[in-house]
Amino acid sequence: MNYEQSIDYIHSIPKFCRPLGNANLEKLLTHLGNPQKKLKFIHIAGTNGKGSTAAMTAEILKKSGFKTGLFTSPYLEVFNERIRINGENITDNDLAEYVTRVKAIMEKNNALVSEFAFITAVSFLYFYEKQCDIVVLEVGMGGKLDATNVIDSSLVSVICKIGLDHTQYLGNTVEEIAKEKCGIMRNGGTAVSYPNNDVRDIIEEYAKSKNVSLTFAGTALPTENGFIYKSKEYPLSLKGTYQPQNAAVVLEIISALNKQGFNVSDKDISYGLSHTSWAARFEFVSDRVVIDGGHNIDGIKALKKSLLSLNRDIVLVIAMMEDKDYKACIREISPVAKAVFATQLDMPRCLSSEKISDIIGSMNIPVFVNNNPKDALQNALDFSDNSIVCVCGSLYLAGEIKKIFHKK
């Protein structure tokens, strides 16, 4: 298969398949030579902050001289973003080659797996054959039943901020969701967690039951260009008032690795934190346009706090998926804006712009409907010369807007 055929094939694989669980993935990986058993992982779960935490960790390890794989989801502009080594996306040719090989083994051995499990298998084989020293592995959804949890062990299991999302699969309370996330911890292993005060006792109890050495990150104090953690000041390139606390988790991850002999220096830590880029996390793509992929209530609250910290007039461009808690999210973020431009994407799951408008219409906030995201952005920019335009509500919308700026 060529690159285009490989991408088409990946997207043709069912999102879910039976039997549920990882039995077929384990079978597939066995026939691939179990590459995951020959790799070292930092395994990252959580509702919010996984990608940023993974990106900062990977950047620090790369600077420290480790060949570092990074597996994340979803992608914003090109599929290749999901599989990276030392910050470089997998090439089109490599992706086509590995998809073709894994597809052949899967079909030959009748080890059919879901789309995400298939991509996970592709990444394991790629990272192993490219001789990665360490892989930063982001959970797709949940933890316990996630395809990434097929790994036997990790150097560090990481629990980022936990909140309500994917409730139809993970549970209707943060307590239930926390238990799912904790499923990535391994007997006798090492774990680091975001403070997660609401479910701290659940995380502690689970860690104790597995004899896991658990560290909760302490409080990070934001500064103008970074943050202070444990009386030491660090630089930080990622914007957003929520990023210093994610960075504190990263510092505890590196501390845990150093206890295992990795010897990452303070200089490499500071360099990594000051050179990390991570798309669509309070990312300014121009002097007036910021994009943020937050799509659950905790992510939206964090975005709201970051927008208010700018002390500028705000105009929103918003789209959301129907399977999210969209009413709560829209009602939370809209009051920060002088006006809202409701838009939508050409996706079955996408909420109509009219529904967004209806929700905002009762809030006495000017709202305009533009079904085309590009038009919505331009109209938002034209609405006020001095305002900041925030594109939010969906990572898919963020990806569409980033493409516009790359074309420029």
Q: Which positions does each model-derived feature cover?
A:
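ATP-dependent carboxylate-amine ligase catalytic core
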Residues: N22, E26-T30, N34-K37, K63-D152, ...
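A glycine-rich beta-strand to alpha-helix segment
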Residues: A376-H406
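Positively charged, low-complexity intrinsically disordered leader regions
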Residues: M1-K40, Q168
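Residue-level signal for inorganic ion chemistry
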Residues: I10, T47, T68, V136, ...
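Nucleotide phosphate-binding/pyrophosphate-handling subdomain across enzymes
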Residues: K37-K38, I134-L137, L145-V158, I162-H166, ...
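Extended acidic/charged loop-beta regions that coordinate divalent cations
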Residues: I119-Y169, R200-E233
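A conserved segment at the C-terminal end of the G1
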Residues: I44, S52-G69
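C-terminal helical cap/extension that packs against the catalytic core
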Residues: V192, N196-T215, E224-G226, I297, ...
